[in-house]
Amino acid sequence: MKLTILHKIVNRVIRKCQSVLGVCTLGSRAIVLNPQNQVLLVKHTYQPHWYIPGGGVKKRESAKAAVLRELKEEVGLSVIGEPELFSIYHHTYLGVSDYPIIYIVKNYSLTNVSSPEIEKMGWFDYGNLPEMTSPGTMRRLNEYFTNCPKSDT
């Protein structure tokens, strides 16, 4: 619990500095589906919600390279072939523009991995997602599973 509070404080300070400097952030995430059409979600040690896996794009790294790296680091997943681009979004959080890029991944191999960032991971049916699924994750999954129009945010 202390880590979550500390993370929130540090995150707010970083976001305030980014806002003052006019920095934008770029993220890369994946909707990973198994053969039963279940989606992979992760719960971080420092966040209360469940998310589709992914993270920030590093300097001189492509969004695709970032999602491949994050999937390997967070859940031990190696993508076979190419991830499919789903959409690019924009939202503002604490005054900072963030651009998450979402991919679809259906072909992969999994190895056992332990990440200090990940508290839990699991496969879920779209109709039976965890109660604490993040609002952004819910929007992305609704767009994917119901074919509703994709939003900008």
What are these regions (language model features)?
Residues 1-29:
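Acidic, metal-coordinating catalytic segment for phosphate/diphosphate chemistry
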Residues 34, 38-74:
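Conserved Nudix-box catalytic region and its N-terminal flanking loop in Nudix hydrolases
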